[in-house]
Regions:
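Phosphate/nucleotide-binding beta-alpha loop and adjacent structural elements of enzyme active sites
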Residues: 1-153
Length: 153
């Protein structure tokens, strides 16, 4: 099921009392297999190997995408680490607020200066959403892409 075509997500957007049900479904049911996996390339395991097991560190995840699906910081969070997750998608940040209340979760597009940029957008929870014009050119050859103006910080 494609997230941006999800009828349930569209209902949850219309009726706020359904949002927590949607978050639970998307984080723990739809993506249950990711609850038992590490990050995509085991970066989190490598980081945990560098520190004593009792060490509680801090992380910064820019472009955090999803609280469980191929997430680089989920294992760290489970080991007691805390940090900051930043993504330009408000739905992603809402899910992080639900799944990781111990973290600071910020909806923002990061840049070296405060300007308006175009967000090239494929869907609510699509990891290919981008601000990069070169990446957009590649996406355009394969996907139906739209854009929105957003402000960077």
């Amino acid at each position: 099921m494609s997230t941006h075509n999800s009828k349930f997500l569209n209902l949850a957007k219309s009726f706020p009392f359904l949002r927590k049900i949607y978050f639970f479904y998307n984080i723990y049911i739809r993506n249950y297999k990711f609850l038992f996996k590490s990050s995509q390339f085991n970066e989190d395991k490598k980081i945990l190997e560098l520190f004593d097991k009792s060490h509680k560190g801090v992380y910064l995840d820019i472009g955090c995408y999803h609280p469980t699906r191929v997430n680089n910081t989920l294992s760290l969070y489970r080991k007691g680490w805390r940090g900051m997750n930043i993504d330009l998608n408000q739905l992603t940040i809402d899910m992080f607020n639900y799944a990781r209340p111990g973290d600071i979760n910020i909806c923002a597009a990061i840049s070296n200066k405060e300007i308006k940029k175009k967000l090239y957008y494929l869907g609510d929870l699509d990891p290919k959403n981008t601000l990069d014009l070169k990446h957009k050119s590649w996406l355009k050859t394969t996907f139906n892409i739209s854009n929105k103006d957003i402000k960077t910080r």
